Structure formats: structure tokens, C-alpha cells
């Protein structure tokens, strides 16, 4: 950032491809300087934001612009701030407000060797776990100036350990609340253990949504590196409340079925991240899957396969990570009661086929586990014993995930769902009987090669849950079972 003070009519001009919010900082900065007890220079000021060909967005430039003007006018002298990062939005009275994107800016500065960080108090907790920094949380422009002059130094933000953040995570919906549903609970545990995509098909009120909302409680907490990735995306999107620290619980995003392609994938004038990126390292829950538009569903295919999504706009292009578990639920027909034992379906065969055909074959191929969720009889609810809690199930899931992380430590992946074809051959050995069973199922069920690969990965997860190094027939049989809805609803 550069400031040039020239003779002429008093004015403040900001150049360097600023957006509207940066241009508006002229009035905010001028008022903040005066109302903080300083003097706005009576000269023509030009603020240059380099590089000139990169668009500058957001009000985070307010504080550094104000400090630069005070230095250019001689009200701040004798200090070198080239190794200090400043950011923050100024109000008209000079107070500082938090800004979105603080975490990625601080991480980028740290990677360039910058240690001293001055930012709004509302952003301090967001960066408290980043080691090796001196973070000074400020409440106003006046406080920043007094700190720089050495009159009233701002206390350095106390650094936090990420383990303290993890210990504060609490389960929102406990699996102990789910009565019955033995098969669905098992499928949920398998999906969580391997990071697999899951589709639940069942009548209204059968418990599909509650099962999905139990998933974050049985998934292991985010690792520190995963937390940085996920929190960075949420910070860019402005989804972090002021005073919020790093995220430890895996995100659970549940967009409405009216969501557009832009809101799902990302977009807008500033190329903001969409739901697939906000769900990075977590869960993207699509309730009433066939109700989403065809374009929106088809747009999911690329991030599901690659784990990244590119958002291109006129002035900038951004690439966001989007490695998530997709969990979807749907009714078996438009009225919801096809195959129900208690209510009669009112839909014609044509209506049911049209409804199911809203989900394309390529998208179905990318869903590893398909399970039917039937309504639980009232007698089973009233007489059933206590179900396992999320803590009990989560302990088993964490054990399996730790096994996978150790196995893939040199391969750059974390769980079985991320295996590619080459790694599958390396890490998924099968007994001859299991191989024969799988080949027979592929021929009879008409599986694509993608579906075949996903059955192998699910079988690897089931074997891990059993503590087996080699995949056996029971593991393959259960994995094949999770593809049977293909034949019942889509290929029948």
C-alpha cells in the first residue's frame, strides 16, 4: 500500500482496482481520522493498492489506509511497518469492526514471514491457534495509534491450543434418540468410518433427517490442518460470528432444495464459496434429493469426484476445496408411501418413474451406500431398549479413521472414500472367494466401473471395522447389499 500527498484541492482517491466497498472507505476513513482526534491532511491524497491488476474487495483495507494517511501527513513518524499486517473495518467514530477473511489473510502473512498482526478484537479468537505470531487485538483507530507510538501498548493475544477447542465440541443430536433402525444405523456407521456418500430412501417420518443430523456427532473432530482449511473457507464466506475461533466440529450444511447452482457451487460478484465448499471436511445433507433442480444435482458431480471446485467471475477466479460426505434422503415416490406397510401409495407407475429419473445414473454411481429406512413400529419404539449413544458409536468410528490415517500417511489422503484406482489395488486385497463374489455381482447387477470401485472401497471400510487386513466374502457381501436399491428403484 502506498500513499502520495500532493498539493491541490483536498481529496482522497483510491486506485488499484478497488471495488465499491473499498471506494466507500474514503468517507469512513476520513470521518474516523477526525473523530479519533487526528487531522485529515489538507492535500490531494492518492492511495495505491498494489498490484493494480488484482481486484481489491471488502472493508479490511480501512485500518491500513487510515494509518498510511497518518504516516504520510507526519502524525505518525519514525516507524517501519513493512513487516506488520493490519486489517479492520472502521466506523465513523473510529471504532474497529471485524471483517470476513481474517484467517486466510493472517495465514498468508505468516507464510511470508510476517509476525506482527493488528486486527479487530472480533477477529482475534479466529487466529488465536496460529502459532508463532504476535497478535494485537484492537478496538479503535486511536488505540492502534497509541500502540504504535508506544504510549499504551496493546497486550498480545494469548495463544490457544487446538486441543482446548476440540475438547469443547458437543454432540447436537445423539444417536441414542434414534429408536430401532438397526440397518440404517449400521449404514451410517459404515459411511462415517470410511467417509462414504450415503443415500437414505424411506417414507415420510421414518427418521431419515434425524439419522443424518446424528452424523457430525459420530465423526471424529477436525484435525488442526482440516480445521484451518474449513475455518478459512467459512471466514471468506463471512459465516463466522464475531469472536468465533477455529472450527473443531465437522460442518453440517443442509441447503434447501430450491438452492441454485451458484449457491451450491459458489459464485456471486466476489466468487464466494458455495455449500459444497462450506461442507469441506464435513457433511453436505441434501434432504428431498429429487426436489433439487437437475442442473444443481449435476453440478455436484465434479466436486464429488475431484474434491475441489473452481469459481470464475469477470474480475477474479477462485478455487475452493470441497471434499465432503454427501448424505441425501428421499421418498420412494411423489406421495412418499410407495412400499409402505401402513399407507397406500397414490402415485401411478409413470409418476414414480418420472420422480426417480430426476436423479441421474452418474450421480447415483457416486453414492457409495444406499439404504432403505422403514418406519419403526410403535411397539418397537415403546418396548425397545436403550440404543447406543453417539459417544459409543463415535469411539468405534474414530478407531477406524485413525487406522486409515496411519495407512495412508504417505499418500496424501485420510480415508477409504478418497482411494483412487491405483491405491485401491494396493490397499484392497481380497480373498479369491470375495473376488469371485464381487465379479458375479457386477455382472448380475450391471454395475459400472465407478460403482465397482466404490463397492471395493466400502468393503475395505467394513473390513477395517472388523480389524481384517484382507477383504473377505462377508465384507464384500455387505458392500454389495448397499447397492441393491439401484435394482429396486432405478434399474428394475
List each language-model region with its residue ranges.
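Peripheral, non-AAA+ core regions of ATP-driven protein-machinery
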Residues: 1-199, 203-209, 312, 451-452, ...
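Basic, amphipathic alpha-helical bundle interface domains used for macromolecular binding and assembly
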Residues: 15-26, 41, 48-58, 270-271, ...
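Catalytic P-loop NTPase motifs of RecA-like helicase/translocase cores
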Residues: 93, 286-293, 336
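Walker A/P-loop
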Residues: 200-241, 306
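Walker B catalytic acidic pair
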Residues: 281, 287-288, 299
